[in-house]
């Protein structure tokens, strides 16, 4: 029996969890600190740890996010692909460290299941039996969004996390994509509002004021 026992903190987290459980593709959108990435990561951990040996289930946590962010380009960063992308995925890694006991059997299972896949090099890949998380999706292009969503394979759930109010692109396709997919079988979109913010209590009033910038 796994020691991992995640509990949601509010009604919006309940909605997000139910959506991810019941649908193949889930968009989680909302302001900074509203637990989008936290919920996606907790769900991935839960699903991986539920799998029993010789049973069907999720085997991999696939993680990615756009690496053209705040002016930085992947090709000019040092190291191999994984080394280049890893810093961008630190929020997901931090959440895993918070939720799973260090040096535990569960942590070993999660670490073995983690796969970092640069968004720029997705072509030709298919993700089977995976919980696949695209973080900071407000910064993906239309072509990247289509490429990512079309990687879904058998037994896979895709979770797209993003805040359309914080984008490094002139035109974000995040909400437009969610609107186009609305009503499609297997798709869900949950918007996490300011009420779901789980970071410091100052974030909500601060972001309200900074929205005027």
Language-model regions, residue ranges each:
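Conserved helicase motor core of SF1/SF2 NTP-dependent helicases
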Residues: 2-134, 138-213
């Amino acid at each position: 029996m796994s020691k991992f026992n995640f509990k949601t903190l509010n009604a919006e987290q309940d909605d997000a969890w139910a959506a991810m459980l019941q649908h193949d593709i889930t968009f989680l959108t909302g302001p900074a600190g509203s637990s989008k990435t936290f919920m996606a990561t907790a769900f991935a951990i839960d699903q991986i740890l539920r799998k029993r040996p010789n049973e069907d289930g999720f085997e991999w946590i696939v993680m990615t996010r756009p690496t053209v962010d705040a002016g930085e380009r992947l090709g000019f960063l040092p190291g191999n692909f994984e080394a280049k992308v890893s810093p961008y995925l630190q929020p997901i890694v931090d959440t895993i460290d918070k939720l799973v006991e260090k040096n535990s059997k569960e942590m070993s299972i999660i670490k073995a299941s983690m796969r970092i896949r640069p968004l720029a090099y997705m072509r030709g890949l298919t993700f089977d039996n995976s919980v696949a998380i695209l973080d900071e999706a407000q910064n993906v292009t239309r072509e990247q969004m289509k490429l990512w969503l079309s990687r879904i394979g058998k037994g896979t759930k895709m979770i797209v996390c993003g805040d359309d109010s914080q984008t490094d692109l002139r035109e974000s396709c995040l909400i437009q994509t969610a609107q186009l997919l609305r009503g499609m079988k297997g798709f869900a979109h949950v918007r996490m509002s300011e009420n779901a913010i789980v970071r410091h209590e100052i974030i909500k009033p601060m972001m309200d004021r900074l929205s005027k910038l």
